Amino acid sequence: MRLVVACLTCACLALLGSCATHHSTSQKTEEKRTREKEARAAATEWLSLVDAADYATAYAREPERLRAATTQEQFIRSMEGRRAPFGRVLSRSFIGAAFTHKLTGSPDGHYESILFRTSFTNKSLAAERVILSRESGKWLVVDYRVY
């Protein structure tokens, strides 16, 4: 009888451990989805400002540390130089996202890199990469590239 109880106890503990591992993995997957969804929404909102050439508002949505290093006028000139050659956005689709704690030239933190496939009037197939940093509970754009 003791052997049966011991076996059942071991089986229950093993099952609980498996459930805890599954729950932990499931919870991490859900956290990843939530993080990615929030970062993607922030990137899409920021891109809509850039699409409308509202560079002043896009600049205001960057982290303070970046605004301290670049004036609004510098940012606007830079964005005009990057985006004007491509023309108007015709379509944009999400490709994927990647999370990291390290970003070259930036302090360690929470970064999400979002990649989009974009069609412009002057370039039918381009890629846009938006890197965001989680700061004070918000996703803020720290880098933008269009290829």
Please report, for each region that a protein language model flagged, where it lies by residue.
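Short solvent-exposed beta->alpha transition segments
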Residues: 40-41, 48, 56-109
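Positively charged n-region of N-terminal signal peptides that target proteins for export
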Residues: 1-4
